[in-house]
Amino acid sequence: MIALIQRVSEARVVVDGAVTGEISNGLLVLLGVERDDDVAKADKLAHRVAGYRVFSDADGKMNLNVQQVNGSILVVSQFTLAADTRKGMRASFAERNADPAVAEALYEHFIAQIAGKEIPVASGRFAADMQVSLVNDGPVTFWLQV
């Protein structure tokens, strides 16, 4: 399971012209579910995302997590993160992506785990054509994989 996390001052996702999720200060999480992922991996990744220290403390060091800065998390499904890009000029999705039904269940489970940590969470719509806008703060972007 892959999370591309970006520290943002604002982010939102629009589906069919309607905003489905929007946050101010916090993290935009693009979430990719791989073939062998399971609930245990989703739990571990949610724990890492929630606790990952990407916000500056009083000394300007990245020592604070999203909860410590009263931030929010916007989660957007992103199947292309699991693509095989090792060769050729086109990504392959057949080998590494999870079955869509499994991926959706793990995506929803991940969101529930974040919400269970009392972090405000918003989301896109699984497998929808979405327009995601953000203001990347820093920029600060990390690739987390479990």
Curated annotation (Swiss-Prot):
Q: Where in the cell is it found?
A: Cytoplasm
Q: RNA-binding among the record's keywords? A: yes
Q: Tell me which UniProt keywords the record has, alphabetically.
A: Cytoplasm, Hydrolase, RNA-binding, tRNA-binding
Tell whether tRNA-binding is among the UniProt keywords: yes
Task: Name the CDD domains for this protein.
Answer: Dtyr_deacylase (cd00563)
Domain of life, per UniProt, equals Bacteria
Q: Where is this motif: Gly-cisPro motif, important for rejection of L-amino acids?
A: 138-139
InterPro entries, from UniProt?
Daa-tRNA_deacyls_DTD, DTD-like_sf
What would you give as a GO molecular function for this chain, any one? Gly-tRNA(Ala) deacylase activity
Q: Which reaction does it catalyse?
A: glycyl-tRNA(Ala) + H2O = tRNA(Ala) + glycine + H(+); a D-aminoacyl-tRNA + H2O = a tRNA + a D-alpha-amino acid + H(+)
Concerning Pfam families, the annotation shows: Tyr_Deacylase
The record's top EC class is hydrolase
One GO BP: D-amino acid catabolic process
Q: Name one GO cellular component term.
A: cytoplasm
Please state the Enzyme Commission number of this protein. Answer: 3.1.1.96
Q: What is known of its domains?
A: A Gly-cisPro motif from one monomer fits into the active site of the other monomer to allow specific chiral rejection of L-amino acids.
Of which family is this protein a member?
Belongs to the DTD family.
Subunit note: Homodimer.
The function of this protein is: An aminoacyl-tRNA editing enzyme that deacylates mischarged D-aminoacyl-tRNAs. Also deacylates mischarged glycyl-tRNA(Ala), protecting cells against glycine mischarging by AlaRS. Acts via tRNA-based rather than protein-based catalysis; rejects L-amino acids rather than detecting D-amino acids in the active site. By recycling D-aminoacyl-tRNA to D-amino acids and free tRNA molecules, this enzyme counteracts the toxicity associated with the formation of D-aminoacyl-tRNA entities in vivo and helps enforce protein L-homochirality.
HAMAP family under this entry? Deacylase_Dtd (MF_00518)
Please state what the protein is called.
Answer: D-aminoacyl-tRNA deacylase
* Originating organism: Tolumonas auensis (strain DSM 9187 / NBRC 110442 / TA 4)
What gene is this protein a product of?
dtd
